[in-house]
Amino acid sequence: MKLTCVMIVAVLFLTANTFVTAVPHSSNVLENLYLKARHEMENPEASKLNTRYDCEPPGNFCGMIKVGPPCCSGWCFFACA
């Protein structure tokens, strides 16, 4: 019983220690993430999540023989729509 309690306390202490020491100045990091997210909400053009680099733009060939990324729009009829 005592060993179980000691193990639980040790695990809790090590977990808390890991979270505290994982990111130096964690309050600044969280603040910067909040400001960046707020900026992206106000200006959706600034969001990198809306940009797809793994797809073909409209007008590019997308036939059956082509091996590569799919069309950004999802529509293909010999050329991306």
Curated annotation (Swiss-Prot):
Q: Which residues form the propeptide?
A: 23-51
- Entry keywords, A to Z: Disulfide bond, Ion channel impairing toxin, Knottin, Neurotoxin, Presynaptic neurotoxin, Secreted, Signal, Toxin
Species: Conus victoriae
The family this protein is said to belong to: Belongs to the conotoxin O1 superfamily.
Q: Which GO terms describe its cellular component?
A: extracellular region; host cell presynaptic membrane
The name this protein carries in UniProt is Omega-conotoxin-like Vc6.4
Q: Which InterPro entries match?
A: Conotoxin, Conotoxin_omega-typ_CS
Q: What does the UniProt entry say about where the protein is found?
A: Secreted
Disulphide-bridged cysteine pairs: C55-C72, C62-C76, C71-C80
Q: Which Pfam families match?
A: Conotoxin
Q: Does the keyword Secreted apply?
A: yes
**Listed PROSITE patterns:** OMEGA_CONOTOXIN (PS60004)
Q: In which tissues is it expressed?
A: Expressed by the venom duct.
